[in-house]
């Protein structure tokens, strides 16, 4: 069967080239480079020296920005962990979108032609912030194009179409359970899933849980190498995270990430960041405020990233 037509990825330019460079670098490390056994249990390890060094800085950031901040980061080479409120719940928001496409990649190899199928949807199904899908109602979009849109520009209608293919929020949650994540849950669709006031458990995750899920899909053996490489391509091509984790890592690092935003100033970013030598660090930053009208502040996540990098390196 024909492979997936991903010619539209060429529009990503520099990010797509960066993804190729990362994969080439990993490819020099072994036959199944970049893959590690999936360890997806959603819990932190014992506090490490790295966590101790960063805790005061995270608390100071919370005070300065008036936000609650959750952090989980792991240097997958050294095993060092930074954790802060890592098992507390935050709104998942659009961070689900990369995981949802990972779920499809697990069930449908690229060579199957599944991602070439055209999905059609009505004008009535188009929700707010859908910059790609709103222009394609007449033609529909392939599954691959929907994944590209929902990851790289966080198109909400594309996210809902991917959820439909998975059996809705319940099907997505079942996928997370299959990874060993007994914590995260998705209950609603875009855009209602972004309404997560303090104390709400619907549509939530924890920094430790979401980091474990992205680690399993991007670095683990949940996906075969072609599908893992495709997911990395989409994440590295993301255009919505330049002021978050990407702004806090050193020059020369390559970041593949998925952002999210919601009510109460909710602001998230989950990433795999490859150092200049190709060593992967998984970083999950989740945040929110008590004021339902609060605005997100990307500087909080950028500064938290700098603290993570300092503690781990």
Curated annotation (Swiss-Prot):
Xref: InterPro entries:
Beta-lactam/transpept-like, Beta-lactam_cat, Beta-lactam_class-A, Beta-lactam_class-A_AS
What species is given as this protein's source?
A: Nocardia farcinica (strain IFM 10152)
Q: What subcellular locations does the record give?
A: Cell membrane
The lipid modification N-palmitoyl cysteine is placed on: 29
Principal localization reads membrane
A GO-annotated cellular component: plasma membrane
Signal sequence, renumbered to the chain? 1-28
Q: Which family does it belong to?
A: Belongs to the class-A beta-lactamase family.
| Other facts | The class A beta-lactamase family has a specific amino-acid numbering system, sometimes called Ambler or ABL numbering and often misspelt as Amber. A multiple sequence alignment was used to derive a consensus sequence and then the consensus was numbered taking into account insertions and deletions. This allows use of identical numbers, e.g. for active site residues, despite differences in protein length. UniProt always uses natural numbering of residues, hence there appear to be differences in numbering between this entry and some papers.
Pfam families in the cross-refs: Beta-lactamase2 (PF13354)
Sequence positions that bind substrate: 154, 258-260
Q: Where is the lipid attached (S-diacylglycerol cysteine)?
A: 29
What's the name of its gene? bla
Descriptive protein name: Beta-lactamase FAR-1
């Amino acid at each position: 069967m024909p492979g997936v037509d991903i010619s539209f990825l060429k529009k990503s330019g520099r990010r797509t080239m960066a993804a190729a460079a990362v994969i080439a670098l990993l490819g020099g490390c072994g036959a199944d480079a970049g893959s590690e056994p999936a360890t997806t249990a959603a819990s932190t390890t014992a506090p490490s020296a790295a966590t101790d060094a960063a805790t005061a800085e995270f608390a100071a950031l919370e005070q300065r920005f008036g936000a609650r901040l959750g952090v989980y980061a792991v240097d997958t080479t050294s095993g060092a962990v930074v954790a802060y409120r890592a098992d507390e719940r935050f709104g998942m928001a659009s961070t689900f979108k990369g995981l949802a496409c990972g779920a499809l990649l697990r069930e449908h190899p690229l060579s199957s032609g599944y991602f070439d199928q055209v999905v059609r949807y009505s004008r009535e199904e188009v929700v707010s912030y859908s910059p790609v899908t709103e222009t394609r109602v007449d033609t529909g979009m392939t599954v691959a194009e929907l994944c590209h849109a929902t990851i790289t520009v966080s198109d909400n209608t594309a996210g809902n179409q991917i959820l439909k293919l998975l059996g809705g929020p319940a099907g997505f949650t079942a996928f997370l359970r299959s990874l060993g994540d007994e914590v995260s849950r998705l209950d609603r669709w875009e855009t209602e899933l972004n309404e997560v006031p303090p104390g709400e458990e619907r549509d939530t995750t924890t920094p430790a849980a979401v980091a474990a899920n992205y680690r399993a899909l991007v670095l683990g053996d949940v996906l075969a190498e072609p599908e893992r490489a495709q997911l990395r391509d989409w994440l590295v091509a993301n255009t919505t995270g330049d002021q978050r984790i990407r702004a806090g890592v050193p020059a020369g690092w390559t970041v593949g990430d998925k952002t999210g935003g919601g009510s109460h100033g909710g602001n998230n970013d989950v990433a795999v960041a490859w150092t200049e030598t190709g060593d992967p660090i998984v970083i999950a930053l989740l945040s929110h405020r008590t004021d339902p009208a609060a605005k997100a502040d990307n500087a909080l996540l950028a500064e938290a990233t700098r603290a993570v990098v300092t503690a781990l390196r």
